[in-house]
Amino acid sequence: ENAMKKGQVYEGVIETVEFPNKGIVNVSQEDRRVIVKNGVPGQKVRFSVNKVKKGKAEGRLLEVIEKAPQEIESACPHFGQCGGCTYQNLPYEEQVKLKESQVKAMMDEAVDGDYIWEGVLESPVKSEYRNKMEFSFGDEYKDGPLALGMHKRGSFHDIVNVCDCQIGDGDYRKLLACTLECARESGLPYYHRMRHEGYFRHLLVRKAEKTEEILIDIVTASEEGFGSKPKEFLDKWAAALQALELSGKIVGILHTKNDSLADIVKDEGTEVLFGQDYFYEELLGLKFKITPFSFFQTNSLGAEVLYEKAREYIGDTNEKVVFDLYSGTGTIAQILAPVAKKVVGVEIVEEAVEAAKVNAKLNGLDNFTFWAGDVLKVIDELGEIPDLIMLDPPRDGVNPKALMKILNFGVDRLVYIACKPTSLA
């Protein structure tokens, strides 16, 4: 009955791609749908079956035999190897169409009855749009030379040097190359996650779109056991960065120590090697102070489009109390505050709440209160009844219990900004 086995190789055409990157191939001779990741609709592919369950099968893409009719050469030489991007082999319009169909399919399933679908708002910039990049140290293959870049697609260990990455601008590429050169010269090893030894971990670069201010932070393990080498590296590196000819302006060079076992950029003490540990960005005429680890939409010009839309949806806020839940550094709150009676923000990350207060002062706004805490717990203590509610939760979405409390306020309008469609649906 179950003729499809692990290790078998098939060919087929990817008919659709479901969120986030699951290509669906119908294998007619077996009458099975197989999920093959990392393809685009219309490609004829060869794949080997690596999982077979009741009615479900998954395959690993071996090669693309025929390109899809709408496929193009990616502008980035790293595409396909690098795990950073998924659809660079499609023109922007096709990427948008594909993502729109994925989200629409989820909403159709989740929403009972009719709803208005407004389609996709495009980003004003299609490449070099990111205001933040995180790069990892490692090697391209076991015991290879030191590398600094992104994880290889589907790999926890291997790193691709992405010196021609197209999603940040030329300054990112220069800073990346300069850092890698200094790191290689130092002879210090990268931090090996399995063995918990080594030095270099991550490079974090943030650059504001409007002010062009740049903040650079290198994340390393502690220097124990490496003698004077780390200090020598940091001095040389900071000097080398300042000597680069960049289009933006470096306002801060930082060094963060992180000895935690997880592979995340985590702050366990940061020293300033040059300048300051923050920079400014502007959105819709407001000014925001951003610290190395605080959350900020990664595409500044795209964020303006998003927040304009949110402002349009929330409608007239005149003389109204607005709750901004999961408020982060207060971006949305401040965009709404100038015309509202009062905005109440709730955010669990203390650092973000402090930043939000600073940002409110910067923009001369005083009709605000910010609460630090979990929305679920704090919502009962706010002592106010909102007229409108704005939600902008993290990827996992809103805790179901918190959602009930939010709905019980019975507001006329609630605007939900979701950064992951599955948690919204």
What are these regions (language model features)?
Residues 23-28, 149-152, 217-219, 356:
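Short, acidic/hydrophobic/Gly-rich beta-strand patch recurrent on exposed beta strands
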Residues 1-7, 11, 19-20, 225-425:
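Rossmann-like S-adenosyl-L-methionine
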Residues 63-74, 83-190, 210:
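Extended interfacial segments that mediate partner engagement and assembly in macromolecular machines
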Residues 42, 168, 299:
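Short, conserved phosphate/pyrophosphate- and ester-handling motifs at nucleotide-, phospho-/glycolipid
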Residues 157-201, 222-252:
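Internal alpha/beta scaffold segment
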Residues 15, 128-141, 145-153, 202-209, ...:
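Short beta-strand elements
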